[in-house]
């Protein structure tokens, strides 16, 4: 189905939630794409209002991936907390809850599904299903 600023998408009226960092170029690009399609949006600046550990675990389920697949390993907090590829899922969830900068962004959620906007164009998948 073709969609766009004048096109229709199946979830046109369903509000999408974006976990957004305004200092991140990819997050800003993803947000701009969604706004261009005029979809209802709930914007969560997750560094100002961090998700709880339970919310992060729920994001894992919605993304269909483990936290190891979307934790930001290049952040200083990752090394400071002694995390590595051998860290358990529980350790990673705890770290992401304590240091939300470790959460890869942007994440767009629609109902029981979510997508990581890497590259930013991936967020448009939420409009096509």
Task: Put a short name on every predicted segment.
Residues 2-5:
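Extreme N-terminal basic, low-complexity initiation segments
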Residues 46-129:
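Thiol/selenol-based redox catalytic cores and closely related redox-interacting motifs
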Residues 12-13, 106:
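Positively charged, low-complexity intrinsically disordered regions
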Residues 28-31, 35, 79, 124:
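Class I S-adenosyl-L-methionine
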Residues 8-9:
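Short, positively charged and aromatic/hydrophobic N-terminal segments
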Residues 14-32, 41-46:
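Local sequence-structure signature of Cys/Sec-based thiol-disulfide redox active-site neighborhoods
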């Amino acid at each position: 189905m073709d969609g766009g600023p004048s096109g229709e998408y199946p979830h046109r009226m369903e509000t999408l939630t974006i976990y957004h960092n305004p200092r991140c170029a990819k997050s800003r690009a993803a947000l701009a794409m969604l706004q261009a399609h005029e979809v209802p949006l709930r914007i969560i600046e997750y560094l100002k209002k961090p998700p709880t550990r339970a919310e992060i675990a729920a994001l894992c389920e919605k993304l269909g991936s483990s936290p190891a697949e979307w934790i930001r390993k290049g952040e200083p907090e990752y090394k400071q907390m002694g995390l590595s590829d051998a860290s358990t899922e529980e350790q990673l969830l705890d770290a992401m809850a304590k240091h939300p900068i470790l959460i890869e962004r942007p994440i767009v959620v629609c109902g029981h599904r979510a997508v990581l906007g890497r590259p930013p164009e991936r967020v448009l998948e939420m409009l096509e299903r």
